[in-house]
């Protein structure tokens, strides 16, 4: 969606919407759920996080400052 590309040519392409709030694509929402399981054994704490971002479909790339990829972690 954001035009980010990985590999030796890691970049945010022409459709990069960095620092432009008109379409709302530069916003990210973070939701975290904490689960505490108590019982006979030691306490176990489990964190489940779901991050939604416009660049989440770009294989780990997201647009950073000045339309650079931050980070570019494609696998």
From Swiss-Prot:
Key word RNA-binding present: no
Entry keyword set: Metal-binding, Metal-thiolate cluster
Pfam families associated with the record: Metallothio_2
Disulfide topology: none
Source species, domain of life: Eukaryota
Residues annotated as signal peptide: none
Keyword Metal-binding in annotation: yes
Entry's Gene Ontology molecular function annotations: metal ion binding
Family: Belongs to the metallothionein superfamily. Type 15 family.
Role according to the record: Metallothioneins have a high content of cysteine residues that bind various heavy metals.
Protein name, per record: Metallothionein-like protein 1
Organism name: Pisum sativum
Gene from which this protein is expressed: MTA
